[in-house]
Amino acid sequence: MRECATALRDPAVTAQTTSPKEGMRRVAAIDLGTNSTHLVIAAVDPLLCSFSLLLAEKSTTRLGERDADSGELTPQAMERTRLALRHCRELAHSHGVEEIVGVATSAMREAPNGLAFLAELRETLGLNLEVISGTEEARLIYLGVLSGMDFADRPHLILDIGGGSTELVLADAQEARALTSARVGAVRLQRDFVKSEPLERERVNFLRAFIQGSLEPSVDKVLRRLAPGETPTMVATSGTAMAVAALLEAESSRSSARLHGKKVSKAELDALVERILPLTPLQRAALPGINERRAEILVPGLLVLQTAMALLGMDQFVVSDRALREGLIVDWMLRHGLIVDRFAYQSEIRQRTVWHQARKFGVDGGRAERVASHALELFDQTKAGFHNFGPEQRELLWAAAMLHSCGLHINTSGYHKHSWYLINNGELLGYSQSEQLVIASLARYHRRSLPKKRHESWLLLDREQRQVVESLSLLLRLAVAMDRRPEAVIDSFQLVINDRVINLQLLPLNPTDDLSLELWSLESCAAAFRDGCGYNLCCSLTTIRVSEQLQAA
């Protein structure tokens, strides 16, 4: 795999630096696009083969605003970019990164003076940004999305609408089947075809036809690579998709700060486009989550997204907040041997991100694993008799068990509430927004009060989510109650449900141990079971293993 960029340290930078924690590595990635310059700084954990973002910066540099006659980058655009990149370099060095990797995309690819400008940046700023092809851009976008989304066994169509080009990828958890790039983007369309606004209907129809003609080769290529009967999931990344998600989220009664994983239907997009088209740029800039620069290019971006969905025959897309710049981080990790197999990396994304958050907040890993093991065993033993949930909910229970005590990182008092906040506002890659909310709520209600209508954590849940939390949070209470000491003391347990009575028998590791602490903790859960679901809880010791009981029966 070829190197995307190398970095040169500038010894003249004297900003105060922050060093990474022992065993951690830091790397910065720069995405020099047609519309914006992006910087991310990542903390890489070699042990877990994962990374978390320490900082994300964006500057609207509009490098794609080229001279109409010569096609060259304008002096104004180059100066905006110089200032932004100098800021990026100083931020990266102040965070103690060991390397800055960076790429330049369509604006630099096409401008006659693009390479000369890159040479100047290397000389003056010590940044070696590499111009990449549209196909390489698509590959890096794929890696970025792959790092933050669970592909499971389904193919995914990834659409990234940039300023100068639009990348369309067909991929699954095994390979990128098709990597395409079309020379149609929000800034390019605005520059070439939008002279006055609001657009007349005739101009809108022209733009749709132009976009369709530009995208059709890419769409044909990806659709040919789909096997008969396959139903792909569509993922949309970058500015236009995030703007759509922000606008729809602002209208929602249950808005969330994080847009990653939000699902948007074609009907919602079509209705939004019709509301946006009559607005002026000034009116668009007044919309929630839309700044002045995004407002200028919002309409072309929306038309690209709408046309792509129609051509692909998709009725919904999922928003990803990871794209090219995160792909640069993954690519750096691959090249440095920190990810041996990117497909194994993908298959474990959920488990890895939970472990990453647990380590971040100082969770006792041994105890968390024991609680998670107890919780899953309780889930399996109570299926059908107490609940009818499947493997998806089982995995959410595991994640909540692993992270239930992360709130201790803030304070021991009311730590379950702190756990809810940290989980709900954290970065759980591979989990959807709704799944993350369920995990947080399970952790919130593993102790103390049962859910109440006035609780914010309860108001955010829909009916199905509440059913999951009501039942599985009770199982998590039992799992936590069975692990109150630094070391394991329970060998195994058996749970039997008769009528509305739950009988729980514990087998101690040490036959002489009466497990008084654990039994006391379990008995304290009885009121929650009685008030929460109408079950009576009875706990006792046994000296016979479950396998021996079955043989005797």
Residue ranges and their predicted role:
Residues 532-550:
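A short amphipathic beta-strand at an alpha->beta junction
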Residues 48-63:
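N-terminal glycine-rich anion-binding loops that anchor highly charged ligand groups
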Residues 5-8, 27, 41, 66-97, ...:
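Helical "lid/coupling" subdomains associated with nucleotide-phosphate turnover
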Residues 484-490, 530-535:
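Short secondary-structure junctions
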Residues 1-26:
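Non-catalytic pre-domain segments flanking phosphatase-related domains
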Residues 21-52:
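N-terminal basic/disordered segments at the start of proteins
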Residues 515-536:
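Short, non-transmembrane amphipathic alpha-helical segments
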Residues 155-169:
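A generic, well-ordered mixed alpha/beta core segment in the N-terminal half of proteins
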